[in-house]
Amino acid sequence: MGFVLYNTLSAELEEFVPINPPQVNIYTCGVTVYDDSHVGHGRSLIVFDVFRRYLEKLGYRVKFVRNFTDIDDKIINKANEENKDFMSIANRYIARYYLDMEAINVKPANVEPRVTEHMEEIISLISKLIELGKAYESDGDIYFSIDSFKDYGKLSKRSPEELEAGARIEPSLKKRNPLDFALWKASKSHEPGWESPWSYGRPGWHTECVAMIFKHLGETIDIHAGGIDLVFPHHENEIAQAESITGKPFARYWMHNGLVTVGGKKMSKSLGNFVTLKEIYTKYHPDVLRLLVLFTHYRSPLDFSFEKMEETKKAYERLKSAIEDIEPLKAIAKEGKPVVDIDFYSLEKSTQEQFYKALSEDFNTSLAIAHIFNAVAELNKAKTESFKIGYITPKELEGYLFLANSLKQTLKDIFGLLEENTLQNTLKTLEPASSVNISTEFLEILIKARNLAKENKDFKVADFIRDELLNYGIKLEDTKAGTIWKKP
């Protein structure tokens, strides 16, 4: 089944045609791990998790790469505030990230590369740009010259002059053009850094993603995804570097989700108007957040409020009641006149057709979920009438179950809803564990996070969790049957 997708690069709806079908390579920019993830991050994670599930349902073989930025000024500042090594800060928040993703049912990426493990590739990429005359050294720093790339601004649809006028750019005498951006920044001797041909330093943000994409996905990928706030300068600068080296399109499709706002202002840590994912999934079932995200078209802004969470919670309860709370209905099944005039089989067919049609038109989850809720309304109508009269006929019950099971399977497979897991159940009742008495439930969650890290070959995080637990006198042992723990 084909579908069309809005391509930020062309600003048009385009038919999706992978480079090497059925393979689809996707890269999405991950988090900078200096603090807990908030709802703004969660929206992007959920949108592209569902998009990936949709592609897989259509039969595509998806390689999904999402990175960790584990070296950044914000991480270094946090480390200085706490008098810790920057890597311990990064590892802490990567571990928490894994907990968040498991809680909100976001599937791990196939590859989750860390910037600090790709210094060789980053330095090699910068060297190539210098050789090509696209980058220059200035007092130990390396800058990309935007004047060397004639298509600069093609993603954001603005000229360099317009970009300069609208951008918040730090003035620097080191730059030839105010829009030139850092590929490598010299570090002070006491700061984190790596040796390079130019200086002891660390990479610029825009270079990191290009190097990781080249290594894990190749020179041209099918889809590059991320938040709309990354179009400029981040994604614009990625294109300039990648296409300067290869002379080929960096990505065939650019897919961007809209911002999460609070009262019309972007949710961000700098404004202090953010709500962490943990705050959400300890107060609500995580499916409520997924549903809130799916109710809005991925390209539109999503204005967050707890009032909307409450409304979504009620909608979710209607959904669960219709699809899962079926035993009381089975108990009153008996022969008699039909209770309702509903053709459950025709409704199932039309709902599925409308559902997939909506998703095929620029991944319109808002319309797709509306079709699901239309069918849910019919199920709840049948339940209400049956309980009022006191029975449902076996034939109607059979049709009801057929429709309910079909909807449930679709919601699980594509939207990642109604997939209860032990972590979600635990989080509903979990009390914060004290530093001297870690609860069994919380310990099991940490083991889950460690196992996820190991599955993704992120052994630094796995070792970090193990070592932190050792500080509390808890020893983890990996056995053939799984991970066991021992307390003194």
Swiss-Prot record:
Main location: cytoplasm
Binding sites annotated in the UniProt record for ATP: 269
Residues the record lists as binding Zn(2+): 29, 209, 234, 238
Catalysed transformations (reactions): tRNA(Cys) + L-cysteine + ATP = L-cysteinyl-tRNA(Cys) + AMP + diphosphate
Protein's UniProt keywords contain Zinc: yes
SS bonds (residue pairs): none
EC class: ligase
GO molecular function: ATP binding; cysteine-tRNA ligase activity; zinc ion binding
Keywords, ordered alphabetically: Aminoacyl-tRNA synthetase, ATP-binding, Cytoplasm, Ligase, Metal-binding, Nucleotide-binding, Protein biosynthesis, Zinc
Span(s) of short sequence motif 'HIGH' region: 31-41
Listed cofactors: Zn(2+)
Subunit structure and binding partners: Monomer.
Protein name: Cysteine--tRNA ligase
Taxonomic source organism: Hydrogenobaculum sp. (strain Y04AAS1)
